[in-house]
């Protein structure tokens, strides 16, 4: 009679662990896919960061892209608002990155002039 009580508990624990492992695999797979999508834009980010004199902020820019769009769509930096005053006007990822990096460079320069930290600029 004791065995019957332990078996459902073991089954429930096994199912819980199995679902947890499956969830972790899906989470890590999606995260890897997002990372790869963002890193596909790295060469354009490096080019624009060097052009705007903020090449030391490459990782920050890539992090912003990951946060804003996961590297998807035509406006990975969500920067059409700063260029055109409205969302969805950017049709090319390179244009979005150029505008976003330029705006970030201006914000960093302004933050340094005002004596505030980097995160205020971001």
Give residue ranges: language-model regions.
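Catalytic glycan-binding domains that act on GlcNAc-containing polysaccharides
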Residues: 32-122
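N-terminal Sec-pathway targeting helices
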Residues: 2-28
């Amino acid at each position: 009679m004791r065995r019957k009580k332990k078996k459902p508990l073991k089954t429930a624990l096994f199912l819980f662990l199995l679902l947890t492992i499956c969830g972790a695999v899906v989470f890590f797979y999606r995260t890897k896919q997002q990372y790869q999508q963002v890193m596909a834009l790295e060469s354009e980010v490096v080019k624009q960061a060097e052009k705007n004199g903020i090449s030391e902020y490459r990782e920050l820019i890539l992090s912003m892209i990951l946060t804003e769009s996961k590297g998807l769509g035509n406006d990975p930096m969500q920067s059409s608002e700063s260029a055109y005053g409205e969302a969805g006007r950017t049709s090319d990822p390179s244009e979005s990155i150029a505008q976003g990096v330029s705006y970030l460079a201006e914000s960093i320069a302004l933050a340094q002039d005002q004596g505030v930290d980097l995160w205020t600029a971001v």
